[in-house]
């Protein structure tokens, strides 16, 4: 069932409730992430059940992800020196547009691949954020990974792939990217780590054992993503 993909939203919201509480005012960057996550959770099912994403639609989703990121962190970006502001703002926009657009175009039709991408992105972002000095954003990322694991596990047990679609893909990848950007702007995560994490969906798209049992596919594709996530964590380490 496509709505099973909302597990990542549930995991993220529960984590946020216990870490900082769910509030909407004052409108900080973290609370804007909350708003964007809820909006993505509403838009995803609409795309699956009422609309069919075309190439133009995917481009609009990618542009929306980039625009949402800049909206969430614009006040923080403006506080940086000019060169840093351009570098951080550009990295954030490019990373979010690419990872969300690529995942929706290339992975949304495969519940195992996109679940593995969200798992690796969530855990990788969470660990990188903790290394960079942000425990709260680290917990958000790990919660996202846990939600993605909850989406993958039933598929592995049943031996059948589940539908993911935009319901899972858009919020899962968007939240992972936003958490990474938050760790960059509000902690000490290097900008290039965000760009490396944006490649997790690409790694999961690489050829794999397509005819193997579902559980083995999940393991292999997750390992692909973990390699890239591990590189991002390793690059984050010297900056801590």
Protein language model features and the residues they cover:
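Generic multipass alpha-helical transmembrane bundles of integral membrane proteins
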Residues: 62-185
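N-terminal topogenic module of multi-pass integral membrane proteins
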Residues: 1-107, 205-240
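C-terminal transmembrane helix-loop-helix hairpin of multi-pass membrane proteins
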Residues: 138-145, 152-240
């Amino acid at each position: 069932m496509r709505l099973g993909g909302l597990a990542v939203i549930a995991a993220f919201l529960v984590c946020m409730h216990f870490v900082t509480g769910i509030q909407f005012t004052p409108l900080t960057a973290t609370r804007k992430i909350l708003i964007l996550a809820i909006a993505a959770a509403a838009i995803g099912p609409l795309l699956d059940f009422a609309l069919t994403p075309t190439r133009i639609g995917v481009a609009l989703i990618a542009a929306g992800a980039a625009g949402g990121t800049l909206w969430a962190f614009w006040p923080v970006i403006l506080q940086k020196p000019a060169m840093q502001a351009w570098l951080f703002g550009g990295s954030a926009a490019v990373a979010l547009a690419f990872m969300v657009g690529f995942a929706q175009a290339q992975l949304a039709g495969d519940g195992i691949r996109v679940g593995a991408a969200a798992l690796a992105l969530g855990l990788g972002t969470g660990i990188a954020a903790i290394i960079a000095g942000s425990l709260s954003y680290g917990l958000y990322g790990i919660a996202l990974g846990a939600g993605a694991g909850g989406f993958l596990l039933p598929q592995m047990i049943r031996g059948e792939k589940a539908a993911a679609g935009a319901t899972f893909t858009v919020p899962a990848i968007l939240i992972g990217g936003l958490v990474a950007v938050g760790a960059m702007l509000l902690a000490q995560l290097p900008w290039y780590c965000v760009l490396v994490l944006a490649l997790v969906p690409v790694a999961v798209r690489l050829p794999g054992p397509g005819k193997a049992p579902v559980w083995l596919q999940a393991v292999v594709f997750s390992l692909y993503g973990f390699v890239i996530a591990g590189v991002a964590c390793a690059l984050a380490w010297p900056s801590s």
